[in-house]
Amino acid sequence: MLNTLVVFLGAGLGGALRYGVNVSAARLGGSFPAATMIINVSGSLAMGILAGWFVVRAGLPQSLRLFLTTGILGGFTTFSTFSLEAFLLIERGALAQAVLYVIGSVAAGIAGVAVSFAIIRHFG
């Protein structure tokens, strides 16, 4: 139960941070999704730092890891988890799996949005 609460609180903070970046980037104007790119890249950088930190400091509490990674970064961007998982596949020498994971995730994600839009436009 404590872990669920820790993730819940972290996700709220991460979501608020994401909203702040979106609001700030909107002031810049333009049609390029700069906020999403900033969020994805900074979240991936933070995930790498945290994952490395938790490896080096193996004795840190599980609740801290959950709060920072699953909670805050999960609320901020799930792209950081995607990036970490792809990197770990590459690091383990599973290059074919990594390529399949990256291409498959991106293609399936875009296809999912396209199919959803088509359904809503048809029945909407």
Swiss-Prot record:
Reactions listed under catalytic activity: fluoride(in) = fluoride(out)
Activity regulation annotation text: Na(+) is not transported, but it plays an essential structural role and its presence is essential for fluoride channel function.
Location of this chain's protein in the cell: Cell inner membrane
Keyword annotations: Cell inner membrane, Cell membrane, Ion channel, Ion transport, Membrane, Metal-binding, Sodium, Transmembrane, Transmembrane helix, Transport
GO cellular component, one term: plasma membrane
Primary localisation category: membrane
InterPro entries documented for this protein: FluC
Top-level lineage group: Bacteria
Family statement drawn from the similarity comment of this UniProt entry: Belongs to the fluoride channel Fluc/FEX (TC 1.A.43) family.
Function of the molecule: Fluoride-specific ion channel. Important for reducing fluoride concentration in the cell, thus reducing its toxicity.
Protein name: Fluoride-specific ion channel FluC
Source organism: Methylobacterium sp. (strain 4-46)
Taxon lineage: Bacteria, Pseudomonadati, Pseudomonadota, Alphaproteobacteria, Hyphomicrobiales
Gene that produces this protein: fluC
